[in-house]
Swiss-Prot record:
It comes from the Bacteria. PANTHER family: INNER MEMBRANE PROTEIN YHJD, UPF0761 MEMBRANE PROTEIN YIHY. It comes from Yersinia pseudotuberculosis serotype IB (strain PB1/+). It is found in: Cell inner membrane. This is UPF0761 membrane protein YPTS_0028. It is a multi-pass membrane protein. Pfam families: Virul_fac_BrkB. Keywords: Cell inner membrane, Cell membrane, Membrane, Transmembrane, Transmembrane helix. GO terms for cellular component: plasma membrane. Its main location: membrane.
Amino acid sequence: MASFRRFRLLSPLKPCVTFGRMLYTRIDKDGLTMLAGHLAYVSLLSLVPLITVIFALFAAFPMFAEISIKLKAFIFANFIPATGDIIQNYLEQFVANSNRMTVVGTCGLIVTALLLIYSVDSVLNIIWRSKIQRSLVFSFAVYWMVLTLGPILVGASMVISSYLLSLHWLAHARVDSMIDEILRVFPLLISWVSFWLLYSVVPTVRVPARDALIGALVAALLFELGKKGFAMYITLFPSYQLIYGVLAVIPILFLWVYWSWCIVLLGAEITVTLGEYRAERHHAKSVITQSPEM
């Protein structure tokens, strides 16, 4: 009787255990931590060129001048925990120095920025085990569109948000408190949508929208928790500041970028494993239904 009850208690957990095993096997086989390390290295190499290109695009549109300042503050406050102000100061100095570059140097910056997008594309297709390759021209067009249209769309959305917030009917206390609550979860929503687009669009194979949404939600939640946990770790255990002093910002930034890519790739692995788990269950059911006939 006791064993029967134990079986009834464990049976709902069996799918979760099976899925967990499949996920762990896939993560181990793909070498998730090594892929995250590769992307972290490329990210640090491409960070300044990417930011330079993005804010150069904002500078080309005078209507985005004020929005670019708000966007900088929003990114560094919500996506880089702790030491965000120090990193922001350094990056702004690097961007200011890059404005004196020649045409050849500017082209080099753009190529380096595109290198990050190419690396993300390659790693995600490794995880999806996709053998379909896009043409070089098509890939370049997609990368360039992401690099140019992405910041412009973000800027346009912030312009619209600023306009809506300036309307008089939104000054009501109840509406104002509701807006505060929405703004509080806004970084989570942005992360969720960004990860969903990443998992849906980048792979060269078809990705079920539901799987991409679930994987993106897990990644977004882990990203928010990781951001708070990382900030707490840096505050409570300031070992990097004690050892490296002024240079502590370098290992801290690398550690955060590496951790962020681990989360992004984990969301991708979850998305892929959901499809594989569903296919395996469907196969098992078909075998069971066919066995009496045999």
